[in-house]
Swiss-Prot record:
Additional information: Heme 1 (or BL or b562) is low-potential and absorbs at about 562 nm, and heme 2 (or BH or b566) is high-potential and absorbs at about 566 nm.
Cofactor note: Binds 2 heme b groups non-covalently.
Binding site residues for heme b b566: H89, H188
Subcellular localization: Mitochondrion inner membrane
Residues that hold heme b b562 according to the record: H75, H174
Assembly and binders: The cytochrome bc1 complex contains 3 respiratory subunits (MT-CYB, CYC1 and UQCRFS1), 2 core proteins (UQCRC1 and UQCRC2) and probably 6 low-molecular weight proteins.
Name of the gene this protein is made from: MT-CYB
Record-listed a ubiquinone binding positions: H193
Example of a GO cellular component annotation carried by this entry: mitochondrial inner membrane
Keywords tagged on the record: Electron transport, Heme, Iron, Membrane, Metal-binding, Mitochondrion, Mitochondrion inner membrane, Respiratory chain, Transmembrane, Transmembrane helix, Transport, Ubiquinone
Superkingdom, natural source: Eukaryota
Listed name of the protein: Cytochrome b
InterPro entries in the record: Cyt_b/b6_C, Cyt_b/b6_C_sf, Cyt_b/b6_N, Cytb/b6-like_sf, Cytochrome_b, Cytochrome_b_C_euk/bac, Cytochrome_b_N_euk/bac, Di-haem_cyt_TM
Protein family membership: Belongs to the cytochrome b family.
Length: 371
């Protein structure tokens, strides 16, 4: 693999001929990132990080700023697109064994954590009712940390409750973290090009490679065009599809919403958090639901890289996908039967996938007589 990264600027990167549509999501994520930075910049020009003015400034953007409604909707729905693409990107990595390129995988999961933090801070900025209460519930989890919890929470809030200093620092963090995402993305791409992309067969593709441009770049454009078309269709016809009705009311610390929940892309982690009736246990499970992705490269025992010819792993993978969807759905429901037991069962199944990987790999080696 050439070490001259300048080649990548001209699309001369050698790529396997047989990579499928599932490899398109990297370029789609890059497009989402560019869109978010651009729309975010124009929104930041008109936004006011003050608890008395934040909600009004969002109304001002959508009503008075030329194309402000489009910028605001593109930014909000673009975030959902970003998470759809990144979850598919990670699922592809799990299915085809891309995680065996350890440095690339580690940088990717770090990117995911940074992205989740950025999205969380961004959700608080409109200072709507759900923004305020979601921020209160999630930041309050820091109090579960032994000894340091109360001090950490007070330090994060900038006071003894969520107030003006909290909003100011959340806006500052939401503005600065995308630059960290851009840096990590560059690192992710450099590390990927060091070893090269994997492929659906999991074999060494060095004998059969073609330049990224024009072959794969044109293939990427198809799905990219579809994504942009879908994004603008939702912005034009269903702009509030991902919004919570409570967030159309200004934050009121005296009135608690009937059901506090974050944006849909955090619901799987929130569902795992709620399924454990203990604050510290729930907070640990929430953190572990993401952090467990770091251990995957070290628990791979199968001799074959992708799951294409590994039926047991395939079964567990599709169980994970359905589990992810079920936890997300259950997290939108109130904490009452039967949703409690559904959340607890699916949370156990979620972690079972990661813990069973080494055993399944070993069993599949035995089934195929691969020593």
């Amino acid at each position: 693999m050439p070490h001259h990264y300048i080649l990548t600027l001209f699309g001369l990167l050698p790529v396997a001929t047989n990579i499928s549509t599932w490899w398109n999501f990297g370029s789609m994520l890059l497009t989402c990132l560019a869109l978010q930075v651009l729309t975010g910049f124009f929104l930041a020009i008109h936004y006011t990080a003050n608890i008395n003015l934040a909600f009004s400034s969002i109304i001002h953007i959508t009503r008075d700023v030329p194309y402000g409604w489009m910028m605001q909707n593109l930014h909000a729905i673009g975030a959902s697109m970003f998470f759809i693409c990144i979850y598919i990107h990670i699922a592809r990595g799990l299915y085809y064994g891309s995680y065996l390129n350890k440095e690339t995988w580690m940088s990717g999961i770090t990117l995911l954590i940074t992205l989740m933090a950025t999205a969380f801070f961004g959700y608080v900025l409109p200072w709507g009712q759900m923004s305020f209460w979601a921020a209160t519930v999630i930041t309050n989890l820091l109090t579960a940390v032994p000894y340091l919890g109360x001090s950490l929470t007070t330090w994060l809030w900038g006071g003894f409750a969520i107030n003006d200093p909290t909003l100011t620092r959340f806006f500052a963090l939401h503005f600065i973290l995308p630059f960290a995402i851009i840096s990590l993305s560059s690192l992710h791409i450099i590390l990927l090009h060091e070893e090269g992309s994997s492929n659906p067969l999991g074999t060494n593709p060095d004998i059969d490679k073609i330049p990224f441009h024009p072959y794969h770049s044109h293939k990427d454009l198809l799905l990219l065009t579809f994504m942009i078309l879908l994004l603008f269709t939702i912005v034009s016809f269903l702009p509030d599809i991902f919004n919570d009705p409570d967030n159309f009311s200004k934050a009121n610390p005296l009135v608690t919403p009937q059901h506090i929940k974050p944006e849909w892309y955090f619901l799987f982690a929130y569902g795992i958090l709620r399924s454990i009736p203990n604050k510290l246990g729930g907070a640990l499970a929430l953190v572990m639901s993401i952090m467990i992705l770091f251990i995957i490269p070290f628990t791979h025992t199968a001799r074959l890289r992708p799951m294409t010819f590994r039926p047991l792993s395939q079964l567990m993978f599709w169980t994970l996908v359905s589990t992810f969807a079920t936890i997300t759905w259950a997290a939108t429901k109130p904490v009452e039967p039967p949703f409690i037991i559904i959340s607890q069962t699916t949370s156990m199944l979620y972690f079972t996938f990661f813990l069973s990987t080494p055993i399944l790999g070993w069993m599949e080696n035995k089934m195929m007589n691969i020593s």
